[in-house]
Amino acid sequence: MFKKVDKKASRTKRHLRVRKKVFGTPDRPRLSVFRSEKNIYAQIIDDVNAVTIVAASSLDKEFSTNGGNKEGAKLVGAAVAKKAIEKGITEVVFDRGGYVYHGRVQELAEGAREAGLKF
């Protein structure tokens, strides 16, 4: 018999496996990505102090036209990078959140790189 694969559970397991290795420090914080069906969210987190330093999402007013599509994801990546550079952060560790590095997640990463963040 075939079992139906629970995509959310497998993503959560993947994320936990990746999070064992990916850790954000004050010098090099973690860029975390969350992708919902309609929107995309990114935040830069210092795991040592358990503080979110910078956050951006496709729900912000300036992204109302694109939403969570690829173009919107690229703009969110650029916005989070711009806010991070204003706070003096230039290097981050990329946490794809258990998602495949493809599509919207990839566009967010490329947008952040083009805006000046180093992974």
UniProtKB/Swiss-Prot annotation:
One protein family per Pfam: Ribosomal_L18p
Function: This is one of the proteins that bind and probably mediate the attachment of the 5S RNA into the large ribosomal subunit, where it forms part of the central protuberance.
Subunit description: Part of the 50S ribosomal subunit; part of the 5S rRNA/L5/L18/L25 subcomplex. Contacts the 5S and 23S rRNAs.
Positions of disulphide bridges: none
SUPFAM superfamilies tied to this protein: Translational machinery components
Keywords tagged on the record: Ribonucleoprotein, Ribosomal protein, RNA-binding, rRNA-binding
Gene Ontology CC annotations of this record: cytosolic large ribosomal subunit
Superkingdom of the source species: Bacteria
Stored HAMAP family: Ribosomal_uL18_B (MF_01337_B)
An example Gene Ontology biological process: translation
InterPro entries assigned to the protein according to its UniProt record, in alphabetical order: Ribosomal_uL18_bac-type, Ribosomal_uL18_bac/euk
Lineage: Bacteria, Bacillati, Bacillota, Clostridia, Eubacteriales
Gene Ontology molecular functions: 5S rRNA binding; structural constituent of ribosome
Family note: Belongs to the universal ribosomal protein uL18 family.
Name this protein carries in UniProt: Large ribosomal subunit protein uL18
Protein's UniProt keywords contain DNA repair: no
Record has Ribonucleoprotein as a keyword: yes
PANTHER family found in the cross-reference section: 39S RIBOSOMAL PROTEIN L18, MITOCHONDRIAL, LARGE RIBOSOMAL SUBUNIT PROTEIN UL18M
